[in-house]
Amino acid sequence: MKIAILGDIHGNIEALKAAYDAAVSSNNVEKIYHLGDLGGYAPFVNEVVDFLIEHAIEGVQGNYDDAVANDKEHCGCKYEDPAQAEMATMSFEWTKANVTEKSTDYMKSLPFEIAFEAEGRRVKIFHATPLKNNLYWHNDRDEDFFLHMARKADADIMIYGHTHIPYRKKSNPPSPPFSKGGRGGLVFINAGSVGKPKDGDARTCVCIADITPDNVKTEFLRIPYDIEKVASAIIESGLPSYFAEKLRAGK
């Protein structure tokens, strides 16, 4: 089974369109999923929601969606840098002030996770971790952390985002408790970010996962799009120009 995953979109409709076109152009993709965090940092949150609905793209709820839809005081982004925290607050307040009821209803409707079986393997999709949707799961976490998350997810293949930095990791732990994973082992995939990459590559990112009984072939497609159009829209919307600078830099 071959699927495409669209990580954190964050109000960037131009990046979403480019990522979607790349996903549907990839041979034999059966399903496209999104990982939530639909608004923030760019001004097209409502257009993003409309696009996902129009194209029947299933997905999960991110911490940003939860916070915006339920009128929370902050996004739960947990920035340690005070300057970044201040910018995040400005983004969050702007998004709450400009989001439509249709968009908040859609965000509220999103599940915490999506689970299914593919090629005899249990797949689970969530925004950040199987426990919390605002915990950062970077690839430098130790093996015990990865195995702990696999136990909590009760899955062989886990797909998530939140960090905006893509990676794939595989583990072949002894059985039990991972006797259901079969010969394919455990696979952990961070799909990166469609709308706000933080790995130094400003192009949009779409993850293609080709699941077989033995393996998960994973590609991270990087697609150019009109970044300046979005950067200009950020500034014109009244959002801080800082977000436009970060978008251009892929940070």
Q: How should each PLM-predicted stretch be described?
A:
Residues 112-120, 169-172:
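Short acidic-hydrophobic surface loop/beta-edge motif
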Residues 2-97, 104:
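Core catalytic region of metal-dependent phosphoesterases/phosphodiesterases
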Residues 99, 106-109, 117, 123:
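His/Asp/Glu-rich metal-coordinating catalytic cores
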Residues 2-10, 122-130, 188-192:
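Active-site-proximal beta-strand elements of phosphoester/diester hydrolases
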Residues 140-171, 186-189:
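Anionic-ligand binding region
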Residues 170-173, 177, 185-251:
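Acidic, His/Gly-rich catalytic cores of divalent-metal-dependent hydrolytic chemistry
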Residues 10-15, 40-43, 64-69, 157-171, ...:
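Active-site environment of divalent metal-dependent phosphoester hydrolases
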